[in-house]
């Protein structure tokens, strides 16, 4: 059936005379005359196989117009026209037969390779005969055309194939995917290993397909992505996407602008997976039930209408590894195809304005669409010459030079073949199968290289006068014919019967080669031919032909001069090396039959060449025969001489006597040997005894040898054990030696490092020791200074206490004086009332010589307290000029003279100074380079002194503890002064020592780093 109504309207564009053409390809029409290539109907022979279409006209005579007008041309194809077979066997095979009437003209060709891969299907005749069989039918039946031509419908084909694939069982579907994946590894025709010239060739490959490295890389990347990032649902979805890719490829959905087809197929698969997903079903049903849109009763009532594969009760399982690998490969190649399409779209020029739909991937590797037109029309305008080269007209030659190279044309052809729609491929398969089935019976022996015989023509009637070719040689053509006595025309039958009655050997037909009567054609009748429909009655041979030339053989009846059939035959090339070298080969022999004159000239030349060759061979044979005759004569003379010299009787007698003597000597030697054998059979007793003694000696020697061997083995074992022990000891000694050597090297290295360090750091140590000694001396001096200051501070405290008592006494005296002054003022003042003083309010009398000014005196650098002046206090004890203990007192005198001993105590130096042990006092930490714990200047208790609060210490206790810790023996603390503790507790040094303490005096000691005790000063 037609796929659409447009088939009838556009049937002229769907007639592919040159075979199946890919989608979007334009087929060039043949504009030249078909008779130029030997085809009267204007149709070119296909160039896609070994088969060749052969047409002969049905008309035999120009006078019989009725027969020629009603005749039809029947053609059949005979494959297996193998060029290599024809060249290797040195002969071609052409079998055919033709009817004797005008109903049918049939021919079969099998032999030398003519134009376009087979024997040319030429329907040429002699120039005076009209070619009436070349008429074409002006009208085309749409139904008949639709039954042979299938229109490409990518969308329908792709969707139909996808639906078909989704319904297949898993096992069959896996097999389909495996077959489809194996197609990507099949090398296309014309594939060759070429170098990569650009980035596009990486995706394209040398023959229009992706290269093997690209396929492996894409498969590996997709397999890694499949295993790492895809869950079970995604894997099953990708598995069905592989079905989509198979359907798109087989249905031609990837050709042209069919993005809608791809999106539709992917959408169908996605919707199916979403509907089948258990999670989505639970979500939708739960949402409907929660929103009260659908009731549970309604769902339970109509749930049986849902297909069982949509009602999932358990989650999906992961696909098998085989299906996963196939899906990964198919999807990887789909991604590669998408990349190739995009890159080809960028490389291809702007599309034409006529709106033709072109497959970008099918056009990969070509610049324009002219390549496809040239490739499809190449078989129309070109033909193969005698030497196997392609011969084209001048116009097509110029156009071919402007097209792409042969590599890109081959790549484009492979792309078109790979992008062929599925239904077109089925149609091509059907045509090929039917054609092979029709001719399988006739080609079963030809395919094995055997000649076809008359027994192979089963089912063909030969009783109506047929002629067929049996063998084609380089210079001869052999043929056979049936019986011409039984024909349909009664008049012709009467003529043949009359001729047979007159002479049985009369030839019923003759042969014309290229329109000329061929005199060297011989026709003989088969003797004793049995009666039958398929019996050979006539055999003939056309000789005198030139090799590698085209001939038109016409078989004409002898009585009516009517053509029985016309056959175009091309003789194969000569296989004889001498003949090939002697015959000049024309530069470009044409396949068209020559004229009669040219044919005769070529035959004459060929005959002369053969005659010359035969003469040369004859001369050579004569020379060879002469040499052989001379050799034979020499041998004959030798034999004659030997015969003549061998006739003497004396020589014969001497020879016979010599032979008799030889016979007697041989008999005597034989008898002696027999006697020796008899003696050897009877062994003497002496020899037996000697043999037994020798045997016993041999056994003893053998035992000694065995004992020696055992001793040797044991000795070897002992020596081996000793050697192994010695080797083990040697190995252990070597190991110890290696360890000692390693240790020695390490010690040497350490020694060298120490020596170098000592050499470099000797001065540094001396300098550090000197600095340490200097620091210790400074610390000792500072400690002595501190002791002196502590003593002065304690004395100042005592003086301050005495001064405080004195001040209290002065304050009491001042208060008493103030009271007296107030009483005096009351006495000296006026009375409080006009009447006078009240009783009891009389003031006291003024004390003579007492005035407040006498009580208060102000001296410079003193502070006044209620009119009293006090001397200024001393500054910090860290000042360079410390106050002496016996300094004169500067306090003012009071009315009451203080004791004399108080005048020797100055004011306290702590009056206007801060605490010496507050947070403002900083110290320097011990250096990290000084790692000696015994040479530290400060104890562990003093390290965090700046991190503590102010010392609340009693200075007297500090002084006592310091003196006790200094190591002075026999010195008791001052009972007047309280002991003062100090945080400066010097640690015992291994190389230094100090001491202090005496009653009323101070002492200090210091020592060098090499001293063992302190010295007192």
UniProtKB/Swiss-Prot annotation:
Residues 1-92, 106-138, 339-368, 575-599, 830-857, 877-907, 964-1017 are annotated as: Disordered. It comes from the Eukaryota. It is found in: Membrane. PROSITE patterns: PTS_HPR_SER. Keywords: Coiled coil, Membrane, Transmembrane, Transmembrane helix, Ubl conjugation pathway. It is a multi-pass membrane protein. Residues 58-75, 1007-1017 have a biased composition (Low complexity). This is Probable ubiquitination network signaling protein acrB. It comes from Aspergillus niger (strain ATCC MYA-4892 / CBS 513.88 / FGSC A1513). The lineage of its organism: Eukaryota, Fungi, Dikarya, Ascomycota, Pezizomycotina.
């Amino acid at each position: 059936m037609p796929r659409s109504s447009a088939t009838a309207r556009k049937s002229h564009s769907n007639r592919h005379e040159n075979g199946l053409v890919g989608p979007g390809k334009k087929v060039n029409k043949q504009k030249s005359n078909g008779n130029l290539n030997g085809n009267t109907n204007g149709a070119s022979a296909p160039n896609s196989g070994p088969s060749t279409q052969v047409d002969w006209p049905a008309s035999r005579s120009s006078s019989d117009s009725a027969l020629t007008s009603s005749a039809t041309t029947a053609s059949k194809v005979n494959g297996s026209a193998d060029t290599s077979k024809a060249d290797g066997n040195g002969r071609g095979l052409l079998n055919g037969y033709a009817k004797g009437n005008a109903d049918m003209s049939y021919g079969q060709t099998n032999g030398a390779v003519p134009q376009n891969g087979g024997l040319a299907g030429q329907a040429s005749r002699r120039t005076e005969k009209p070619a009436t069989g070349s008429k074409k039918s002006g009208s085309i039946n749409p139904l008949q055309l639709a039954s042979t031509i299938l229109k490409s419908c990518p969308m329908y084909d792709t969707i139909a194939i996808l639906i078909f694939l989704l319904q297949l069982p898993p096992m069959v579907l896996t097999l389909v995917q495996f077959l489809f994946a194996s197609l990507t590894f099949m090398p296309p025709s014309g594939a060759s290993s070429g170098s990569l010239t650009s980035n596009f060739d990486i995706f394209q490959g040398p023959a229009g397909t992706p290269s093997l490295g690209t396929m492996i890389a894409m498969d590996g990347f997709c397999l890694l992505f499949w295993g790492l990032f895809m869950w079970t649902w995604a894997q099953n979805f990708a598995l069905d996407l592989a079905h989509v890719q198979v359907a798109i490829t087989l249905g031609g959905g990837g050709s042209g602008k069919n993005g809608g087809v791809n999106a539709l197929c992917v959408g169908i698969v996605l919707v199916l997976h979403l509907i089948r997903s258990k999670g989505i079903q639970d979500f939708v049903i739960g949402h409907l039930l929660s929103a009260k849109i659908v009731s549970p009763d309604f769902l339970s009532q109509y749930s049986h209408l849902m297909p069982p594969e949509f009602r999932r009760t358990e989650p999906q399982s992961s696909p098998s590894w085989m299906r996963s690998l196939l899906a990964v490969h198919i999807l990887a190649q789909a991604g590669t195809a998408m990349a190739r399409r995009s890159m080809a779209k960028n490389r291809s020029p702007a599309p034409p304005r006529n709106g033709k739909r072109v497959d970008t991937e099918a056009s990969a590797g070509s610049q324009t669409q002219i390549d496809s037109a040239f490739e499809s029309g190449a078989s129309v305008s070109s033909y193969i010459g005698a030497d196997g080269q392609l011969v084209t007209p001048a116009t097509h030659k110029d156009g071919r030079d402007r097209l792409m190279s042969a590599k890109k044309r081959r790549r484009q052809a492979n792309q078109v073949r790979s992008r062929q729609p599925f239904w077109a491929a089925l149609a091509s398969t059907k045509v090929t199968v039917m054609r092979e089935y029709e001719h399988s019976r006739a080609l079963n022996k030809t395919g094995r290289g055997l000649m076809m015989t008359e027994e192979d023509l089963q089912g063909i009637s030969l009783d109506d006068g047929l002629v067929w070719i049996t063998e084609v040689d380089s210079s001869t053509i052999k043929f056979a014919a049936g019986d011409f006595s039984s024909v349909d025309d009664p008049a012709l039958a009467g003529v043949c019967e009359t001729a047979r009655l007159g002479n049985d050997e009369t030839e019923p037909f003759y042969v014309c080669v290229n329109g000329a009567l061929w005199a060297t054609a011989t026709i003989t009748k088969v003797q004793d031919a049995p009666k039958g429909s398929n019996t050979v009655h006539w055999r003939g041979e056309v000789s005198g032909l030139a090799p590698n030339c085209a001939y038109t053989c016409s078989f004409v009846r002898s009585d009516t001069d009517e053509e029985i059939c016309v056959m175009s035959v091309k003789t194969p090339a000569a296989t004889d090396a001498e003949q090939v070298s002697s015959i000049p080969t024309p530069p470009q022999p044409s396949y068209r039959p020559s004229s009669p004159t040219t044919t005769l000239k070529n035959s004459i030349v060929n005959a002369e060449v053969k005659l010359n060759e035969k003469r040369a061979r004859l001369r050579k044979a004569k020379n060879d025969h002469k040499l052989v005759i001379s050799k034979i004569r020499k041998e004959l003379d030798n034999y004659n001489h030997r015969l003549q010299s061998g006739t003497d009787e004396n020589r014969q007698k001497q020879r016979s006597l010599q032979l008799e003597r030889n016979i007697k000597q041989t008999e005597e030697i034989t008898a002696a040997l027999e006697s020796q054998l008899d003696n050897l059979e009877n062994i003497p007793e002496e020899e037996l005894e000697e043999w037994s003694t020798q045997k016993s000696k041999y056994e003893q020697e053998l035992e000694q040898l065995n004992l020696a061997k055992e001793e040797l083995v044991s000795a070897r074992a002992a020596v081996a054990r000793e050697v192994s022990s010695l080797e083990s000891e040697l190995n252990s000694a070597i190991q110890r030696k290696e360890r000692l050597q390693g240790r020695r090297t390490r010690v040497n290295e350490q020694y060298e490092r120490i020596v170098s360090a000592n050499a470099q750091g000797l001065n540094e140590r001396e300098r550090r020791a000197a600095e340490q000694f200097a620091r210790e001396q400074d610390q000792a001096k500072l400690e002595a200074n501190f002791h002196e200051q502590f003593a002065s501070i304690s004395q100042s405290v005592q003086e301050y206490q005495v001064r405080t008592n004195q001040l209290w006494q002065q304050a009491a005296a001042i208060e008493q004086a103030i009271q007296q002054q107030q009483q005096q003022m009351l006495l000296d003042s006026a009375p409080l009332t006009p009447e006078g003083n009240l009783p009891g309010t009389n003031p006291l009398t003024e004390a003579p010589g007492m005035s407040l000014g006498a009580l208060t005196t102000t001296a410079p650098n003193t502070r006044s307290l209620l009119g009293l002046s006090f001397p200024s206090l001393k500054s910090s004890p860290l000042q360079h000029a410390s106050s002496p203990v016996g300094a004169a007192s500067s306090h003012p005198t009071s009315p009451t003279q203080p004791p004399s001993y108080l005048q020797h105590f100055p004011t306290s130096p702590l009056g206007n100074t801060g605490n010496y042990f507050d947070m403002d006092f900083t110290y320097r930490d011990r250096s990290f380079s000084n790692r000696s714990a015994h040479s530290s200047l400060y104890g562990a208790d003093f390290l965090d002194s700046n991190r503590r609060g102010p010392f609340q210490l009693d200075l007297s206790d500090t002084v006592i503890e310091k003196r006790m810790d200094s190591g002075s023996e026999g010195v008791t603390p001052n009972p007047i002064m309280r002991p003062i503790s100090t945080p400066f507790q010097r640690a015992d040094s291994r190389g230094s020592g100090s001491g202090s303490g005496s009653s009323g005096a101070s002492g200090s000691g210091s020592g060098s780093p090499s001293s063992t005790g302190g010295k007192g000063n």
